[in-house]
From Swiss-Prot:
The complex is composed of six subunits: RnfA, RnfB, RnfC, RnfD, RnfE and RnfG. [4Fe-4S] cluster 1 binds at residues 385, 388, 391, 434. Belongs to the 4Fe4S bacterial-type ferredoxin family. RnfC subfamily. Residues 482-503 are annotated as: Disordered. InterPro entries: 4Fe4S_Fe-S-bd, 4Fe4S_Fe_S_CS, Ion_transpt_RnfC/RsxC, Nuo51_FMN-bd, Nuo51_FMN-bd_sf, RnfC_N. Keywords: 4Fe-4S, Cell inner membrane, Cell membrane, Electron transport, Iron, Iron-sulfur, Membrane, Metal-binding, Repeat, Translocase, Transport. The lineage of its organism: Bacteria, Pseudomonadati, Pseudomonadota, Gammaproteobacteria, Pasteurellales. Residues 375-405, 415-444 form the 4Fe-4S ferredoxin-type domain. GO terms for cellular component: plasma membrane. It is found in: Cell inner membrane. This is Ion-translocating oxidoreductase complex subunit C.
Length: 702
C-alpha cells in the first residue's frame, strides 16, 4: 500500500519542478475540439415538457414526494432519499406534474425508467432561495448535507454522489486534484466552463478545500486547452492555496488512476481507491455545481452539454436543463436529421448510440454528437482475433484484453476475474486499435454484467441463509426462554403453596394417587391373587334389569273409578296376578344373583340367606296369587259398584305384595353384609330400587 505522505511529497515536487510522469499504453486520436470550443456557453429556449428521470446517478432512486396534478416550482425537490446513495432530483422549471410513468431512458438499452413529466407554465419561477456570501459561515457537515440535498453528483462521467465521496474522505485527504483534463475527443464542455466561469469554479474548489482540509490542491488540465489554463492562472495570481498543472494530451489521461500516475508517478494498486492513498479527485463541473448549491442556493437542475458533429450547423456548448428532450436541443442548433447516421450520447470512445432522440438530458450527458459520412462509417464486420497484441500494448491498465475476450466469449467468469476484468476502465482503447474490428468493450461490459448478476444471486442466497439461521436461532431462544419462564413459575407456585400449607402439593397429589391405586388393587383382588370382577358383574346385571323395567309400558291405565264393568275388573285382576308373580320371580332371581357373589366369604351363610330369600319370595307370590283369586271371585258380582270396590282392593293388595317383595330384598341385603359389606350394600340398594319401581308400575297398571 502506498503511503499518503509519499503522494504528498510527489505533488510538492511537481509543484516546485513541474515534473510529470506517464502511464503505459494510451493513444492519440484526432481531437476534433475546435469546432465546438470557439463560442461561449449559451442558453436555449425551454421545451414544452420536461422528462425528469428519478435515477440520474450511480445509486438508487429516491421516494417520490410529488403526485400527478401537483404544481411545482423551479428547483423544487421531487424525490427524497434515506442515505447518500439515494440522490434527490429537482424540478428544472415551474409547471404542473402531468404524469409519472416509465419513459425511454438515456441508456444504450433504452429501457424505460420511472420519469416525472412536467408541463411548463412559461414563468420559470424559482422556489424561495437564501443565497450566502461567505461559505465559512457553514460547517463542513452542513455543506456536505446541502450538497446531498441539492442532488450533486460527479459530472465527469461516473456520476458518483459527491456527498458520499466527501463523507468518506473525512480527515484522510492529503491532496485534492481537480480534474480538468477532458481527454476524450469532441467534448469541450469543461474547457468552456473553465474559460467562461473561472471565478465561480475557483470558489467551488475553495469550498471543497474547506471541507476536505487537504495540504495541497492541484488543477490538472491537458495542454490542448491553452485558453482555459491561461484563464485559471490569471485568476490565481497572488493565491497560494492551489496551483495549475498542464499535462500532455493523451487518451485516457482524464481517468482518475492515470491522472494520479501522471502527477505522482505512483500506480494505484488494483482493487484500491484513491482515497486510501490520501487523494480525492473531483471534476471541474462538480466544483462549479457545488458553488451554485452553497453560495447561490441552487440545486443541480442544469449542466453544460457539448453539441457537435457535422450534422449540426450551429455547434457549441449550451446550458441544458435536466429532463430536456435531446431532440429539442438538436432542433435549436440546426440539426440536419439523417436516418443513415445515428446520434451519439457521450464521446466517440465511451459514448453510445441513442436508441431514441426523445430521451431526456441527465446528469451523465456531457456531449451529443451528430456525425456525417466523413465522421461516421458503419462498423466493419467482426473478424477473428489474430493475437497481434495491439490491445495489450495500448491498454493503460496493463491488462490482457485478448485473453479477457476469450474468457468473455466462453463465459468463464472465474478466469475473467483472475485476469482482473474488474480493473478495466472501459476506455475503449483496445477496440480502437484492434485490426480485426472486435468490439472488445461490448464483450467486457456484458461479461461484467453477467458476473455481477452471479454475485448478486450468490449474495441474495447468502442473505437468505443468514436470515433463516437467524430465525431458527431466534425461535430456539424464544422456546428456551418460554420453557424457563414456565419452569420458574411452576417452582414459584410450589414454593408458595409449600410455605402456606407446609408440603409440596405436587408430591402430595402423587402420594394420594398412589395410595388410591393401592387401595383399589386390594379391594379388587381375591385371596389367591386372581382379579375379582364380581362387583362389575353385579352392576352390569343391575343396569340390565333397570333397562328392562324402564321398557315396561305404562299406557292405557284406566282410572280407578272407571272399572265398573265386571269383565274389565276380571282382566285387571288377572294382570295384577301376573305382575305380582313376575315381581316375586325377579326378587327370587335377585336373591339368587346376590347369593353366588357372597359365597367367597362364607358358603353356609350364603346358602341360609338364599333359602330365606326364596321362602319369602314364595310367600309373596302365594299372597299375590291368593289376592288374584279373591279378585276373581269378587268380580263375579254383577253390581258395578261392588266390582269397582273389588278392583280397588285388588290394587291395594298387589301394592302390599310388591312392598313385601322389597322388604325381602332388604333382608337379603342385610344378611349378606357379613360376607362383604360393600357388595351387600350395593346389591340391597339395587334390589330396593328395582322392587319399588316395579310396585309403582303395577299400581299404575291396576
Amino acid at each position: 500500500m502506498i503511503n499518503p505522505n509519499l503522494v504528498l511529497e510527489r505533488i510538492r515536487q511537481n509543484k516546485k519542478t513541474g515534473q510529470l510522469w506517464t502511464y503505459p499504453g494510451g493513444i492519440h486520436p484526432n481531437q476534433n475540439k475546435l469546432q465546438s470550443n470557439q463560442k461561449p456557453i449559451r442558453s436555449l429556449h425551454l421545451p414544452k415538457f420536461f422528462y425528469v428521470s428519478t435515477v440520474q446517478h450511480s445509486g438508487w432512486s429516491g421516494e417520490l414526494i410529488v403526485k400527478v396534478g401537483d404544481y411545482v416550482l423551479k428547483g423544487q425537490q421531487l424525490t427524497q432519499g434515506e442515505h447518500y446513495r439515494q440522490l434527490p432530483v429537482h424540478s428544472p422549471t415551474s409547471g404542473k406534474v402531468v404524469a409519472i410513468e416509465p419513459y425511454v431512458s438515456s441508456h444504450p438499452s433504452g429501457l424505460p425508467e420511472t420519469t416525472i413529466i412536467i408541463e411548463t407554465d412559461g414563468k420559470d419561477e424559482w422556489i424561495e432561495r437564501h443565497p450566502i456570501e461567505d461559505f465559512l459561515t457553514l460547517t463542513s457537515d452542513q455543506i456536505i448535507q446541502k450538497v446531498y440535498q441539492y442532488g450533486i453528483a460527479g459530472l465527469g462521467g461516473a456520476v458518483f454522489p459527491t456527498a458520499c465521496k466527501l463523507s468518506l474522505a473525512d480527515k484522510r485527504c492529503k491532496v485534492l486534484i481537480i480534474n480538468g483534463a477532458e481527454c476524450e475527443p469532441y467534448i469541450t464542455c469543461d474547457d468552456r466552463l473553465m474559460q467562461d466561469f473561472t471565478a465561480e469554479l475557483l470558489e467551488g474548489i475553495r469550498i471543497l478545500r474547506y471541507v476536505l482540509r487537504p495540504e495541497e490542491v492541484v488543477i490538472a488540465i491537458e495542454d490542448n486547452k491553452p485558453h482555459a489554463i491561461a484563464a485559471i492562472e490569471q485568476a490565481l495570481k497572488g493565491a497560494n492555496d492551489m496551483f495549475v498543472r498542464a499535462i500532455p494530451t493523451k487518451y485516457p489521461s482524464g481517468a482518475s488512476d492515470q491522472l494520479v500516475q501522471i502527477l505522482t508517478g505512483l500506480e494505484i494498486p488494483q482493487g484500491k481507491r484513491t482515497i486510501e492513498m490520501g487523494i480525492v479527485m473531483h471534476n471541474v463541473g462538480t466544483a462549479f455545481a457545488i458553488k451554485r448549491a452553497i453560495i447561490d442556493d441552487e440545486p443541480l437542475i442544469e449542466r453544460v452539454v457539448t453539441l457537435t458533429g457535422d450534422k449540426i450547423r450551429n455547434k457549441g456548448n449550451v446550458w441544458a436543463r435536466l429532463g430536456t428532450p435531446i431532440i429539442h436541443l438538436l432542433e435549436q442548433v440546426d440539426y440536419q436529421a439523417d436516418r443513415r447516421f445515428p446520434v451519439f450520447l457521450g464521446g466517440p470512445m465511451t459514448g453510445f448510440i441513442l436508441p431514441s432522440l426523445q430521451s431526456p438530458v441527465t446528469k451523465t450527458a456531457n456531449c451529443i454528437i451528430a456525425p456525417d459520412h466523413f465522421e461516421y462509417a458503419p462498423p466493419e464486420p467482426e473478424r477473428n482475433c489474430i493475437r497481434c497484441s495491439n490491445c495489450s500494448d495500448a491498454c493503460p491498465v496493463s491488462l490482457l484484453p485478448q485473453q479477457l475476450y476469450w474468457f468473455a466469449r466462453a463465459e468463464d467468469h472465474q478466469k475473467s476475474m483472475e485476469y482482473h476484468l474488474d480493473a478495466c476502465i472501459e476506455c475503449g482503447v483496445c477496440a480502437y486499435v484492434c485490426p480485426s474490428y472486435i468490439p472488445l468493450i461490448q464483450y467486457f461490459r456484458q461479461e461484467k454484467a453477467k458476473i455481477n448478476e452471479v454475485e448478486q444471486k450468490a449474495k441474495k442466497a447468502e442473505e437468505a441463509k443468514l436470515r433463516f439461521e437467524a430465525r431458527e436461532a431466534r425461535l430456539q431462544k424464544e422456546k428456551e426462554a418460554r420453557t424457563a419462564r414456565i419452569s420458574q413459575a411452576a417452582d414459584k407456585r410450589r414454593e408458595e403453596i409449600a410455605q402456606n400449607q407446609g408440603a409440596d402439593p405436587v408430591a402430595a397429589a402423587l402420594e394420594r394417587i398412589k395410595a388410591k391405586q393401592t387401595a383399589i388393587e386390594a379391594v379388587k383382588t381375591k385371596e389367591n391373587g386372581e382379579p375379582d370382577n364380581s362387583e362389575l358383574m353385579t352392576q352390569r346385571r343391575a343396569r340390565r334389569l333397570a333397562k328392562q323395567t324402564d321398557n315396561i309400558k305404562t299406557t292405557n291405565v284406566a282410572p280407578e273409578n272407571e272399572i265398573s264393568d265386571p269383565r274389565k275388573a276380571a282382566v285387571a285382576a288377572a294382570l295384577a296376578r301376573a305382575k305380582a308373580k313376575k315381581t316375586a320371580q325377579q326378587a327370587d332371581g335377585l336373591a339368587a344373583e346376590v347369593a353366588p357373589e357372597n359365597e367367597i366369604a362364607d358358603p353356609r351363610k350364603a346358602a341360609v340367606a338364599a333359602a330365606l330369600a326364596r321362602a319369602k319370595a314364595r310367600k309373596a307370590a302365594q299372597q299375590a296369587d291368593g289376592l288374584a283369586t279373591e279378585v276373581a271371585a269378587e268380580n263375579e258380582i254383577a253390581d258395578p259398584r261392588k266390582a269397582a270396590v273389588a278392583a280397588a282392593l285388588a290394587r291395594a293388595k298387589a301394592k302390599k305384595a310388591a312392598q313385601q317383595a322389597g322388604e325381602v330384598a332388604k333382608e337379603v341385603a342385610a344378611e349378606n353384609e357379613i360376607a362383604d359389606p360393600r357388595k351387600a350394600a350395593v346389591a340391597a340398594a339395587l334390589a330396593r330400587a328395582k322392587a319399588k319401581k316395579q310396585a309403582q308400575q303395577k299400581g299404575l297398571e291396576e
